[in-house]
Regions:
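Intrinsically disordered, low-complexity repeat segments enriched in small/polar residues
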Residues: 11-12, 335
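Positively charged n-region of N-terminal signal peptides that target proteins for export
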Residues: 2-11
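Kelch-like beta-propeller repeat domains
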Residues: 26-378
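Bacterial N-terminal signal peptides
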Residues: 12-22
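Small-residue packing motifs within transmembrane alpha-helices
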Residues: 7, 16-17, 181
Length: 378
């Protein structure tokens, strides 16, 4: 059941988030463009007194944020609706202007079908949307190589260079506000360990040092400075039944300062809580932390029913990896109304923003949630 008192508290916190100016932390998987310096300091317009949920329940939606000049925009791309079937997957897209406080439909993602498992990131003054997979009415699936660049200022899309090895359910991060990293994921041929790097200036791809652990998809993480951290996800089951099981491995990668394709990988100790799948993950340059919330310990395809045939439910554990101390930190081991089936987490100065997702009982939600970054008082 929904804790309405807690939801009221979250609503109040969200209002404070917008009124305070919503200075978005430098974060991954969504990096922000730097505003041009105005002649005189300019303040954001006052925020609306109420923040709406998404227009429709949506899960497995790619999310990102972008700040251009003094305007902060949050985005939700594609995803799966309440029916949790292939025909409930949509190519609709929405943006939220912090000064308005509600969601507006933007130009749909180009293509004949919607996708899930896609990755999104803001770079400079554009949003980039990568890969994902289509679910056909007959039951088949196909991972696509599509890369779309969206210009918020003109509400239009452009096609960018295809992903060399098409992937879905990868970890995404942005380096030096130019290079987008796709870490692992699954392709049409199976789960991959590739790290693929996209240069937004040259519209070109290169391959970086692969991940040394098991190939995984549905893992979570972020890129802060020159450091990538990812956790868990699903890996192929050697016994074959079920086909995929949760991976409990956590890894940190350091990008070579002189060669962006070289990554030194180090295995990390286990994080708080059990191994999980489709956690919401994202990092903060300001905090020097990578945050994680929700997810489930029972991997599934898209409807919330595990590969083992059992229903999946979200985990209540919220935690982070502190890049200064190189240690895991528990924020809340009993987060109210947890969610799963996420493709990213937006980090702000005031908290962690989750957009949509799947609640307990595999219920798709339109809820927009703000979680505290501070550890829960004992």
């Amino acid at each position: 059941m929904v804790d309405w008192e807690n939801m009221k508290t979250l609503s109040v916190l969200f209002v404070l988030l917008f009124v305070s100016g919503l200075l978005l932390a430098q974060s991954t998987p969504q990096q922000q463009s730097q505003p041009q310096s105005p002649a005189q300091p300019q303040q954001p317009p006052p925020a609306k007194s109420q923040v709406d949920p998404l227009p429709d329940p949506i899960s497995n939606n790619a999310v990102a944020a972008l700040r251009v000049h003094w305007q902060l925009l949050l985005f939700s791309f594609m995803g799966m609706g309440a029916k949790k079937t292939g025909d409930a997957i949509t190519n609709t897209a929405f943006s939220l202007d912090a000064t308005e406080g509600n969601w507006s439909a933007i130009h749909p993602v180009p293509g004949t079908a919607g996708r899930i498992g896609a990755m999104a990131a803001g770079v400079r003054d554009q949003l980039y949307l990568f890969g994902g997979y289509v679910v056909y009415a007959q039951g088949g699936e196909m991972v696509v190589p599509d890369v779309g660049a969206y210009q918020p200022s003109h509400d239009r899309w452009f096609r960018s260079a295809d992903i060399p090895k098409p992937v879905a359910d990868s970890v995404i991060g942005v380096y030096r506000d130019r290079y987008v990293y796709l870490v692992g994921g699954r392709s049409n041929a199976g789960v991959v360990n590739n790290v693929q790097v996209y240069d937004v200036e040259k519209d070109m791809w290169s391959q970086a040092t692969p991940i040394p652990g098991p190939a995984v998809f549905g893992h979570a993480g972020g890129l802060v400075g020159e450091t990538i951290v990812y956790v868990d996800g699903a890996r192929e089951n050697p016994s074959g039944n079920p086909k995929y099981v949760a991976s409990d491995e956590c890894w940190m990668g350091k990008i070579d300062h002189h060669d962006r394709t070289k990554i030194q990988w180090t295995k990390l100790p286990s994080h708080p809580g059990t191994a999980r799948y489709r956690i919401a993950g994202g990092g903060s340059e300001t905090d020097q932390k990578i945050y994680f919330a929700g997810g489930t310990d029972n991997p599934y395809d898209y409807n919330g029913i595990g590969f083992d045939g059992k229903p999946s439910d979200p985990s209540p554990v919220t935690f982070d990896f502190n890049l200064r101390t190189k240690k895991w930190e528990t924020i809340n081991d009993n987060t109210p109304d947890p969610t799963m089936d996420h493709r990213g987490l937006l980090v702000t100065h005031e908290g962690l923003v989750l957009i949509g997702g799947m609640e307990t009982g595999q219920k798709v939600t339109a809820r927009v949630t703000l979680l505290s970054k501070e550890p829960k008082a004992k």
